[in-house]
Amino acid sequence: IRRPPRSTLSSSSAASDVYKRQLLILLFVGALAGTWMISGIIPAMVYYGLKILDPNIFLPACIIICSIISVATGSSWTTSATVGIALVGIGKALGIPAGMVGGAVIAGAYFGDKLSPLSDTTNLAAAVTKVDLFKHIKYLTYTTIPSISITLIVFIILGFLQVSDGTTDNTYLLNAISEKFNISLVLFIVPLLVLIMIVKKTPPLIALVIGTLVGALFSLIFQPQIINELSGGTNSSIVDSYIVIMNTITGEINIETNNVILNDLFSTGGMLGMMNTIFLVIGTMVFGGVMDAIGALKTISKALLKWADTTFKLFASTVASCLALNVSASDQYLSIVVSGKMFEKAFKDRDLAPENLSRTLEDSATVTSALIPWNSCGAYHSSVLGVSVGEFFIYAIFNWISPFMTLLY
């Protein structure tokens, strides 16, 4: 039996490591959401969000907030798992359709993911095309800034159409939250700690684990009444508290309030709630690996490359290749790497700067991955935000307008 080339083995090993990290991150995102719920962190985000954010500007504010967090962390996944969850909750409380809020969160998260020098896909696209990272980011702004500007304008209009009078009374929601939880700005120490760790380039998994554990500690300090309620007693022992926290991390919990909207919002599935997404990602990993191993992905790109007999068709073929691989291989990393390698020579032959290719890869591979339900990114965001891809697809304007923008440019 012939031994596979060393490069193939190392590539497979690297891909395997990436997927392992993704699966563990998914598990601990579920755990984090659980401890942040019983500690009052997510309820506090919802509480202050309802007090501060005007309903008319809530949707564009979602984009701006998520953009800032995503640029700082370099991760659309982290953005969804932290402020994204809270913003969807605030939107539900305001009566704004979850699809709209989900689309705004996704738009902001991927704007930052594209332009952040900390982003894995930004670094990957630059590395594959042999482009300086900051020159790559500069080229990205040519299409990304117009795309996010159009998206913001649309969401400003949607915001005023959705809440035309701006007189929404949230007093009953605020009272229901404050009656159930001990709300304090001190609770924001935990998400701030997680964001600082990620900005300081702490591995995301470690940041999530620490965020989960500190969230559990805060639940014991600030929300003992919630621990007592979930344990079924009035004065929980150390063992009872431990069981409640472990159940929160691993399984489903529901915190009952006197408000139906909040009852639906203040429930999490823990690690167990992420299992469907994890199984989908595993299936994606296997399918994408098989497609790559049999040469199907390269065949798709080669077929499109033959059609590219003009400069416009070359850009269009690159976009089509990225979209096709995102759909067939269900993974943005494979889409970037395979398309980047296949079209590198064609761009060079036409005397096109490699920055054009790196930008096109990001405009078509990175952002569209969230729009495909069976893609690892689409499955992740849908699961974390509790909003299906079908619901937020039409509102994720930034994501589906970006490929067209790169062709227009």
Descriptions of predicted regions:
Residues S16-P43, N56, P60, G232-A296, ...:
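Core transmembrane alpha-helical segments of multi-pass membrane transporters/permeases
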Residues D17-L23, Y48-I64, K92-V101, K180-F188, ...:
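Membrane-interfacial loop-to-helix junctions in multi-pass transporters
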Residues V105, D113, P117, I148-S164:
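Transmembrane-helix bundle segments that line or gate the permeation/cavity pathway
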Residues V128-T144, I148, V286-G289, A308-Y409:
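C-terminal transmembrane helix pair
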